[in-house]
Amino acid sequence: MGDRRPQDRPRSQGMDSKPWYCDKPPSKYFAKRKHRRLRFPPVDTQNWVFVTEGMDDFRYACQSPEDTLVCRRDEFLLPKISLRGPQADRKSRKKKLLKKAALFSELSPVQPARKAFVEEVEAQLMTKHPLAMYPNLGKDMPPDLLLQVLKQLDPERKLEDAWARCEAREKTTEVPTESGKYPCGESCPRPPETPVSRLRPQLPKTPVSSRRPEPPKTRVSSLRPEPPKTRVSSLHPEPPETRASHLRVDPPETGVSHLCPEPPKTLVSSVHPEPPDTGASHLCPEPPETRVSHLHPEPPETGVSHLRPEPSKTQVSSLCPEPPEAGVSHLCLEPPNTHRVSSFLLQVLKLDSEKKLEDARARCEGQEMTTEELTKPGKYHFWESCPRPFESRMPHLRLVLPITRRMASLCLKPPKTRRVSSLCPEPTKTGASHLKELFQEDTPSTMECVSDSLQRRHTSRKLRDFKWAGDLGVNEESISSLFDFTPECRTTDQDQKIKKANECASRLMYGMELDDMDEVEFLRIKYWDRRRRAAPHSYSAQRGRIRYGPWYFEPKLGKKLRSDEPLIDPKPVLEKPDEPDILDGLYGPIAFKDFILSKGYRMPGVIEKLFAKKGWTYDSVKTPIQRAVQVYKYKEDVTDASKED
């Protein structure tokens, strides 16, 4: 039968063939037209513009479209090439999900919950606790005051270490100081502080007691060293201070108490600093004598100094129990350095916006005001000692003295004898052991604790010999004013100015002190500064668009113009008469032309341009030399004929 399916019939070439300009498609960088098919720009008849012949005059405005057929033209004749490839429309870029499509999105409900959880954790980590900026808050602050701050600012007890430290200190302070509760050598907890200033309590005087009674006040100043800090706690009696030797019997190191007679008092005294208020019991143990003594930091209240002589001992001796050897020291534990507590607490209390801690704020402000009043210069004479600063309710605030050479020079050294070395062996400590214990190392914390009032108080003792100067009306202000600079001599930043070479004085410019090389360098700098200065009428380049006339002008007629200047009319330029040449009215060029022609030489270009410009010919314009020669020759002939006759 055969295949009966309709076979494809051949078609003519014109039905499916494309035009010749579509065989090779244009570049993809050509900007596509909207709503119509892309055409090659020269072939697109809608962009054709028919213009008239001749030159257009665009001096005042565009040409009138009377004789010009202008078709609609949306774009320029040449194709636009974009740097980026063809891009889709902005509206079509954004893919918005419909309401129904949002329900069937690929995001699971767990992902938004996880995202919210991560944001919450990041917010908790980023927000810091208000007290997190002060890591040493518990060390530099008294426990009672820190506990009040923590109750208000940290009710959730996030700072566990600070809460535990404060509660532990409160428990130790609440336990009463009962006698006999603690064995020998252990430190007794500190009794609760009161608003009363930290004075050493007066103990009752008993015939048999390990406590030392307060001595009467006499004119002789008492100097008593501070007990050294050793590992073995012991209560040493004070050795006899005589001119011959120091007799001291060390008791055996046992737990049994011994009778330690106290020596009689002599005129020589020891420096005695006020012991710090700590948690230790208020017993006054006598330390062993060392080579270096200490100054008493407490100033005298009146003109009469404190007299603290040792009371005369009787046959009844005082009981001085010797504690066993242990790691616990008999000295009070050193409290933390809290000199900056007031200023530090004011910064912390700024977090208390509701001002609930009014007592703490008042205590801090009062402490700062008292320290400012005492450190004002010129309040006391230089031979008078500054009174002791006001004792605040801060129990751990202790002032530490600096180490100076003047302090070391005032230290009293007891005489050394053989009997001392045999009976009382020297302790294994350096000569400055007590000095290191009393005057701590020069750390930043200790140096900041030293106030100007303490320095003035210790240095004033040496100045008492100059009391006669005070009777004459000389005080610290009058002396310091002699060494003070006046406001005229004080330099400021405004007065400091670097002068140029031409601003120097003439005696410095032409001085003989300059060497040859220095003078050359100086002159070079001087004239270099002068060259940098611009002339008053110098040309300054102005940024602007410059053009050289229309494109149909001849290059010779082109002129440099700004974009805002009008164009030059070409017709007057062409019809403008030539300017008179300097050779036009001269007789010499015409005579020179005749001379060249008579000799048969080649005519110079200057003469050719002159005759071409004027439109002259060589025969029409001649000099009257020939006529003059003929007239002159005729006259000569006439004269010769007359002579012959």
UniProtKB/Swiss-Prot annotation:
Protein origin, superkingdom: Eukaryota
Basic and acidic residues bias: start-end ranges: 1-11, 238-251, 288-299
Spans annotated as Disordered: 1-23, 168-321
InterPro entries found in the cross-reference section: FAM47
Family the entry assigns: Belongs to the FAM47 family.
Protein name according to UniProt: Protein FAM47B
Gene behind this protein: FAM47B
